[in-house]
């Protein structure tokens, strides 16, 4: 082989261009049924019998990834040298200030949502009860139905206007983003506004939805917005937040926002932190724990202060969108622990059943209804009609009971007003059992189910309520309205928990059914979402007492084990249905015998360190790859020695601002007018398309020195690596691209996130 060191730079560039003319296909190994890769499970989920379909793979291929790794280039290193201790403290202090504002804003949003929901629900029941008190059954139903339909119509209409990302809980999208997936517009202003308005209306409409999931999405969107503080539409890019405009810092603030949203929804700051750690965040640090806890406390305090601190009552113990009071009474005996374990078993079975039906229902919606706004609107209105009819007329099924028969001993919620029942069409002094559970808001229903008395409800109404709640929770999940699942699942769990508690109290005296309702709620939540520590802490924070800790822990752990035996959590299935390429913490066992050379793309497009503009334009026009290894020709022909990696967006910025020169390439060329601040500012924006750049012949013959801008510390692996170890690098370091080199440091392949599925 002849030496290439003495060739002119233009000839060496042409040689590299010819060597790299073939564009790698990141899916070339997926179509070969005989390949080692295809013979194993191609998905990171735990179910052994699942494989991604070609359509699912293609959808995942079209989804881009985020850049969590630091771009350690020459500009960045020079900036590090200029950074003093004072500037570092300023950036750190700025993060705490952002957290403070994030907590206050999310707390204010939670307060506004609760106040508006109370207003709308109050108006609905005010007009409905006007006809109920006059014995006008038909008029009362039509009023009840009409208002519910109006709220659902407006809620669904808001989703149609704002986009599908404003519907449901938004947790799958948040999990995907925090895992490294770029879900476009999921945290944009339109999705945020649509989510808030749709949530207020859907939660007021009587549908079996809750506020906690959307609040997590809302908190994440606020965290993303306030940390970036920019507007591409208005061309607003203040330099004050420049150092935070990167995917890594944005990811941290989204994690904080997700925790803050839950903390504001439940008034549970510790539960919010644990939720972000256990469920949504894929990357965590000790510093992030401190900031998340601080922000959650600020959000919970802000909501609480606005709800109670401004008013006449000085009490500050009852917080959140959902509040259940507190008790210091010890309400169970250790001989009942076996019964609590049984509740965990039932919660796991019902949770797995819920996930199973939810999967198939959403699959049917995806195939039949698609994204058709008219069909989606019709479905939401139809579900509202059926829900209103059942909740209204089910209250007539059972006979009325005398209010005087209820003996209030005490309650999980000590506020005695929580046990006030709904009279509905019953005579004075009597109440409707199902009406007290179905004809009202979920907060009141849960308070009544948690009340400490065994003669408030009889067994048949509790059974009917549990079945109705489960059925409509399944049906309402996935509608084109904003709504979560925590509260509906708590209602289902409280229903079967109290039913079980009152059943065994027929044979064993001194059984407190209220604690069974509480434990049942925790078991049902763990059964469908498979969280453990987070749920235990949330339930303890809701009741403001640790006396329920042992039974809740038992029920939650058993419920998770039972549910995991049948399927995964509902959020993982939803991510799969939405084709969000989520990397689990560990690869499937079936990939243990796969090498990285089996999945890597071997014909890689590479760039020289000093690249001609003409070559760059041709390469960018001929493919849509998002990163290119940068090489330096070795002493022999065809050698491609790895030097670094550069992103497509960064190349577009360099081309747009004409960072050109016509030197020999012997010295590193650094444009003084394109410093670190300029480079960071421009790369934080959406890059201009190549089609809008017009170059003359002089510019096309010029060169760009990529060395100051490429990431020279990018992670690489040898072609002898196993798939499992490469997977761990992607998962633990938040990588987007991973060049593969041989023993001579030559680029022989490329692996992306999409190659892991």
UniProtKB/Swiss-Prot annotation:
Q: Which residues form the CBS domain?
A: 600-667, 710-757
Q: Where in the cell is it found?
A: Membrane
Instruction: State a GO cellular component annotated for this protein.
Output: chloride channel complex
Pfam families per UniProt = CBS, Voltage_CLC
Top-level division of the source organism's lineage: Eukaryota
Q: Which residues lie on this side of the membrane: Cytoplasmic?
A: 1-96
Q: Which CDD domains match?
A: CBS_pair_voltage-gated_CLC_euk_bac (cd04591), ClC_6_like (cd03685)
Reported function: Voltage-gated chloride channel. Chloride channels may have several functions including the regulation of cell volume, membrane potential stabilization and signal transduction.
What is stated as this protein's family in its record?
Belongs to the chloride channel (TC 2.A.49) family.
What protein am I looking at? Chloride channel protein C
Organism of this sequence: Dictyostelium discoideum
